[in-house]
């Protein structure tokens, strides 16, 4: 049975006991409203560790002033049942006061330069600063051997890996594959914001990513591929933030060179819902 923990001292006691037994510990950080994509991360963690802690914390410092912090879906009972079903050992539910004892305005903040400034960083200033700050705190609270993050938030994964290297956290970072609906739409907690009419339209993002990958692998000029992707998404009713081809480290590729490993990334709005997705190749 899953152990739900809200006290930091108790969490540290549990983890210390596991350590005394020589057990490996994994952390799966989440913001709740969990779906099959999240649960796949827990199952991946179980392959690499003896015990799994999953945190649920809707982190206020990674939301911008006009984003959906207040209305972000919170489903604690369903989250607990789902985590228990996939073998999570501890559900860590910290309060805002536990995570930010001095308040969110006075807290120490972490920032990873360069990779945090592009793509999502352009459209969501301060987002990765909030992500790095809360993830570093979770690392210090749980002291895991391994931590698992979803590849749907690909830039977040790259940023966290850089932070771990720069700050010498002795933690292995794993990326879990994107879990998709039957029509290719990447599973996301924000999909529930889509109307019945918008839901079929949303799958066009994945089809566009496939077209981008195929065009690049056939020798297409990256700027042309990106421009066509924007046209395609706009024709499907999206307001596009970006549709780009990048190297796997998010560096910009050189035209005329077929890159592998590479990645196509899209962020676009359908009505009031902002969706992100990517496709590695």
UniProtKB/Swiss-Prot annotation:
Coiled coil stretches, renumbered: none
GO molecular function list: ATP binding; pantoate-beta-alanine ligase activity
The pathway entry for this protein reads as:
Cofactor biosynthesis; (R)-pantothenate biosynthesis; (R)-pantothenate from (R)-pantoate and beta-alanine: step 1/1
Tell me, in a sentence or two, what this protein's role is: Catalyzes the condensation of pantoate with beta-alanine in an ATP-dependent reaction via a pantoyl-adenylate intermediate.
Query: What are the binding positions for beta-alanine in this chain?
Result: 62
Gene Ontology cellular component list: cytosol
EC assignment: the record states 6.3.2.1
Residues bound to ATP: 31-38, 150-153, 179, 187-190
**What UniProt keywords are attached to this protein's entry?**
ATP-binding, Cytoplasm, Ligase, Nucleotide-binding, Pantothenate biosynthesis
Q: Where in the cell is it found?
A: Cytoplasm
Name the InterPro entries on file. Answer: Pantoate_ligase, Pantoate_ligase_C, Rossmann-like_a/b/a_fold
Gene name of this polypeptide: panC
Q: What is the top-level taxon of the source organism?
A: Bacteria
**Record's family?**
Belongs to the pantothenate synthetase family.
Positions annotated as active site in the UniProt record:
38 (proton donor)
The beginning of the lineage is: Bacteria, Pseudomonadati, Pseudomonadota, Gammaproteobacteria, Lysobacterales
Protein name (record): Pantothenate synthetase
Q: Does the keyword Ligase apply?
A: yes
């Amino acid at each position: 049975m899953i152990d739900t923990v809200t006290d930091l001292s108790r969490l540290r006691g549990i983890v210390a006991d596991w350590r005394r037994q020589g057990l490996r510990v994994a952390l799966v950080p989440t913001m709740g409203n969990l779906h099959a994509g999240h649960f796949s991360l827990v199952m991946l963690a179980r392959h690499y560790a003896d015990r799994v802690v999953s945190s649920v914390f809707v982190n206020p410092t990674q939301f911008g002033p006009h984003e959906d912090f207040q209305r972000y879906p919170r489903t604690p009972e369903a989250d607990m049942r789902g985590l228990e079903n996939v073998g999570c050992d501890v559900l860590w539910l910290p309060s805002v006061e536990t995570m930010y004892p001095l308040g969110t305005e006075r807290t120490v903040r972490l920032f990873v330069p360069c990779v945090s400034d592009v793509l999502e960083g352009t459209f969501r200033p301060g987002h990765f600063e909030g992500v790095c700050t809360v993830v570093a705190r979770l690392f210090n609270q749980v002291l895991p051997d391994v931590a698992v993050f979803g590849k749907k938030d690909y830039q977040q994964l790259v940023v966290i890996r850089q932070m771990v290297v720069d700050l010498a956290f002795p933690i292995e970072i794993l990326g879990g594959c994107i879990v998709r609906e039957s029509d290719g739409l990447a599973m996301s907690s924000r999909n529930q914001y889509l109307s019945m009419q918008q839901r079929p339209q949303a799958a066009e993002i994945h089809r566009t990513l496939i077209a981008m990958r195929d065009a690049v692998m056939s020798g297409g000029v990256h700027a042309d591929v990106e421009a066509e992707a924007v046209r395609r998404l706009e024709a499907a009713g999206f307001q596009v933030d970006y549709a780009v081809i990048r190297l796997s480290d998010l560096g910009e590729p050189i035209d005329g060179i077929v890159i592998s490993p590479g990645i196509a990334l899209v962020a676009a709005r359908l009505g009031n819902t902002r969706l992100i997705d990517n496709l590695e190749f």
